[in-house]
Amino acid sequence: MALKTFNPVTPSLRQLVIVDRSDLYKGKPLKQLTEGKSSSGGRNNNGRITVRFRGGGHKQTYRIIDFKRRKLDVAAKVERIEYDPNRTSFIALIRYADGEQSYIIAPQRLSVGDEVVSSQQADVKPGNAMPLASMPVGTIVHNIEMKIGKGGAMVRSAGTFAQVVGRDQGYVIIRLNSGEQRLIHGQCFATVGAVSNPDHMNASIGKAGRSRWLGRRPHNRGVTMNPVDHPHGGGEGRTSGGRHPVTPWGKPTKGKKTRSNKSTTKFIVTSRHKSKKKG
């Protein structure tokens, strides 16, 4: 997929750069693999805002994606590649030899008519799923499970990938895009290839209204607010906030470490922070 630019007929078109999706399927999604989805507007079950600057946006239908890929040793044919409003990557509709259909995350270099399979031992080609232990060192993978049978949790965004870099006592070492290297159990499934739509990162929204279509409301900085609304608020004229950056609730932000999950730290071989310092 390439990027699409426009003649600057209006100021917003001058800035606009979008992904050319002309090659994607243009019809509606498969009805039995969709379900309704209600917008929360950033509110929780008490009706209170838990995520700021969310709301509005176009109504979306949720596509049920098969992240587990546990239908083993049954070949499936790619029927079409589709747009999915719920994620940055594209999705592929596949039909198994027994007639069952499902959606999977579409990897790069997967085309209509290709065959994919999920197996304990499969060919190393885009779209095939297998345990990490079955993959050769150096394989590019995505949609990686963190717990056996739970379904892919990591590396699902547009253009992302991880690489198998080693093995260690039943575990496999993978290198993530962040530079982090971590141990994952060898029986956890992953899919071969990098996620589709790598040009997503180069797209430019072009105008405020397009952000609203996506359900994003205006994002206000703390220094533009009043003291009642934010610790950085107030002051005569434009001020810098007068203190280290904090959240609206006074917690340090911009670099403050917040990771509290100590139980899985042992699986991190190389921290993403240390890998960046070396580079």
Curated annotation (Swiss-Prot):
Keywords, alphabetical: Ribonucleoprotein, Ribosomal protein, RNA-binding, rRNA-binding
The organism's place on the tree of life at top rank: Bacteria
PROSITE patterns per UniProt: RIBOSOMAL_L2 (PS00467)
InterPro entries: NA-bd_OB-fold, Rib_uL2_dom2, Ribosomal_uL2, Ribosomal_uL2_bac/org-type, Ribosomal_uL2_C, Ribosomal_uL2_CS, Ribosomal_uL2_dom3, Ribosomal_uL2_RNA-bd_dom
GO terms of biological process kind: cytoplasmic translation
Region (Disordered): 202-279
Family the entry assigns: Belongs to the universal ribosomal protein uL2 family.
PANTHER family reported for this sequence: LARGE RIBOSOMAL SUBUNIT PROTEIN UL2M (PTHR13691:SF5), RIBOSOMAL PROTEIN L2 (PTHR13691)
Name the record gives this protein: Large ribosomal subunit protein uL2
